[in-house]
Amino acid sequence: MKVLELGSCEEKIKILETLDYTNNPEILESIISKLDDDDIQVRGEAFSSLVLNKNKISNFLIKGLNSASKNIIGFTLLVLANRNETIAIPEIIKLAKDERSMVRECAIGALGYLKAQEAKEIFLKSLLDSNLEVRKSALQAVIDLNITVSENKIKEMIKEKDSEIEKLLFQLKKK
């Protein structure tokens, strides 16, 4: 596993490509740490390795949500969503209020993807988040989960003058 820590990008990728079957705790922690690698290809391969892993690794992934790294948290949230790990919803909900907008955006996106109806109030509150990407994630979740949005919130969002928000609001009104 020293290769994952000290190897070249190519060596790390080659090793990660072979680890999508592992349930070894040390190896899983090492893979999760690669979600914060300097090289985007290494991060992508670590992501794929975790998503494709057929073992019950949700506890290791949930543990990764306690990282200090916003990259590890963000990518781990996306891995949990892609694996349909609904068991992680309570932990993901906590991160929807994180001070880092990237973490909030990924948490809201993961909750929406997991169809977390219990996060309805978080989605509605996040429609007026200070960060545009968080607002977009919340709006997509609201659309996907058929959550009713007040006219006042819609009017507030129209002021945004963002083409993606406008498209999403159009979808919302069609429902």
PLM feature segments, named:
Residues 7-8, 38-39, 68-69, 99-100, ...:
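Short inter-helical turns and helix N-cap capping residues of alpha-solenoid HEAT/ARM repeat scaffolds
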Residues 2-3, 9-24, 33, 41-55, ...:
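Structural detector for internal amphipathic alpha-helices that build alpha-solenoid repeat scaffolds
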